[in-house]
Every structure is written in C-alpha cells, then in structure tokens.
Amino acid sequence: SGHHDETTDEPSESSKPCCDQCSCTKSMPPKCRCSDIRLNSCHSACKSCACTYSIPAKCFCTDINDFCYEPCKSSRDDDWDN
C-alpha cells in the first residue's frame, strides 16, 4: 500500500490538500487529524478516507499526520468572513 499510480493529470488548485478544522495533540511529534466533512470524497493527499452511506456521502480523512494542511477557506478568498 506504499505506492500509488501516477496516471492522473496534474492536480488542479482545487484538489490541493487543505483542512479547515485540524486538531493536534501536544505530543512530540504532534498527532494531527483533520475533521472536515466533505461530500463524496476526501482531499487529494488523504490515504484513508471514510465515508457514510448517505447520498451524497459525507467523507472525512482518518489520516494522522504531524502537521496540518493549509486552511481551505483562506486560499480562495482571504477577505471574506474571517
């Protein structure tokens, strides 16, 4: 499970991994998890994505990283409701 095929086209800006609700433990290194809920898929860098069986499916990434991804909201419109 360590390799993934490079058959997809260049990822677009919108498929960059991002997370608005990220929480980390205070351990070293920190264990960070993104709790964003997305419809039908997880962000592009997610290795283990869990989805509900509803329609549309609500998906979240269960990966544990030692960092948080960039926030999704700020990348598009910085000045809107902060």
Curated annotation (Swiss-Prot):
Top-level taxon: Eukaryota
Record bears the keyword Cytoplasm: no
An annotated GO cellular component: extracellular region
UniProt entry tagged with the keyword Phosphoprotein: no
A Pfam short name: Bowman-Birk_leg
Keywords: Disulfide bond, Protease inhibitor, Serine protease inhibitor
Record site: Reactive bond for chymotrypsin: 53-54
S-S bonds: 18-72, 19-34, 22-68, 24-32, 42-49, 46-61, 51-59
Residues covered by region (Disordered): 1-24
Residues marked Reactive bond for trypsin (site): 26-27
One function term, GO molecular function aspect: serine-type endopeptidase inhibitor activity
Family the entry assigns: Belongs to the Bowman-Birk serine protease inhibitor family.
Described function: Trypsin and chymotrypsin are inhibited simultaneously. There are two separate reactive sites for trypsin and chymotrypsin but they do not inhibit simultaneously.
Protein's name according to its UniProt entry: Bowman-Birk type proteinase inhibitor
Source organism of the structure: Phaseolus angularis (Azuki bean)
